[in-house]
A protein has these predicted regions:
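Active-site and adjacent substrate-binding regions of carbohydrate-active enzymes
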Residues: 1-178
Length: 178
């Protein structure tokens, strides 16, 4: 990664990494720690239904465990601490320029917990402490405007906003050619 960073800088290219702050794999060390020590260090990182002995998951996918941003410890390891998942890579020797944030529209939200704006404002603040020019691109399946007001994310990838007009255009073009 360091060699890639050096090569990209030499070519005046931006280096963006991808992270999934919304959920983690069932095989992630945090999940394994929780399963071994139910009251351990990572217990509060997840939504866990004790009555049914199951994790809350992303869109019902059993292998994708939803992260619980009510946990201040989770926020520390994800973006607050200097060596957090977000900040570590924004600093030397990696010095990445940007993050693509997977499932940005659902991060921090689960049932009555609607923490997305709070999480993105905080994450932006801490990311910019490590790299004042850090660029944050959120993945959205619909309109991301609510998070693009200057204090959360810098831009969004909007699948429907791109795909729907493209499909309509292609379909229209195809009909005219035939």
């Amino acid at each position: 990664l360091i060699a890639l960073r050096e090569a990209s800088q030499a070519r005046n290219m931006t280096l963006m990494l991808d992270i999934t702050p919304n959920h983690c794999s069932y095989n992630h060390p945090w999940v394994k720690d929780f399963e071994t020590h139910i009251d351990g260090n990572t217990a509060e990182f997840f939504y866990y239904d004790e009555a049914n002995d199951v994790f809350e998951t992303w869109l019902g996918v059993p292998s994708l465990i939803k992260l619980n941003y009510q946990s201040q410890k989770l926020r520390d390891v994800m973006y607050r601490s200097v060596d957090s998942a977000i900040r570590k890579w924004l600093q030397p020797p990696y010095n990445i320029d940007a993050w693509r944030l997977d499932v940005a529209n659902m991060t921090g939200n689960q049932a009555s917990d609607q923490l997305d704006h709070e999480v993105w404002r905080e994450l932006r603040h801490y990311a910019r402490e490590s790299n004042p020019d850090a660029y944050l691109l959120g993945e959205y399946f619909q309109d991301g405007t609510a998070h693009l007001q200057g204090d959360e994310l810098d831009a969004s990838m909007n699948y429907q906003g791109f795909n729907v007009p493209l499909r309509r255009w292609l379909t229209s073009e195809a009909k005219q050619v035939i």
